[in-house]
Amino acid sequence: DSDDEITPDCISKMVEIAEREHVQMVCGNVKTIKLDTREETDAFKLVITEKKIEGNKQIFDLFVQGKFPVPSWNKLILLDFLKKNQLYFTPGLFAQDSLQSFETALVLESVCFLQDYTYIYYLHQDSVIHNRKKKHFDNWITIAQIFEKHYQNEKYPERKKQILAYIIDYKDLTLLMNWKAQKNEQLWKYSYDA
């Protein structure tokens, strides 16, 4: 995000791990600071304790359990992996971290987690977390519809069950966040009915 920052050694630490461990992705830890009070919180702190995970089944399991970072920032991803799997952001689609991370987790075979803080997230009243409009609701609906396509196209029953659970959790979370941010019954109902 443009109002956040990476630590001076963020990229060098991630590159060193990626090259040493031969992984497709490295995720760093996040320090969250409330801008008005300078208070530090653990809003985006890594919850996973493993240093390296290999195998898509285990990676996807951890992702749908919520133990894998969802924000798109603070990740170093192998460019060839992104191109091979056509993992691109959709122009004009807002807040697609969940979509990008979900689609990455569907195919990711190796990841390392760096417990060092490599990203500083500044939480303030102008943060997207606190400011949502109808376009944001529309984008979340679009993202849920893309998840639904992955669900419909999935061949394996166990993974299909996991995708459905992820869709339900995603919808619950976005409805809750939208209510907290807007307290607009009409927009909330619009999102709920979609």
What do these predicted regions represent?
Residues 2-112, 119-132:
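Donor-binding/catalytic cores of nucleotide-activated saccharide
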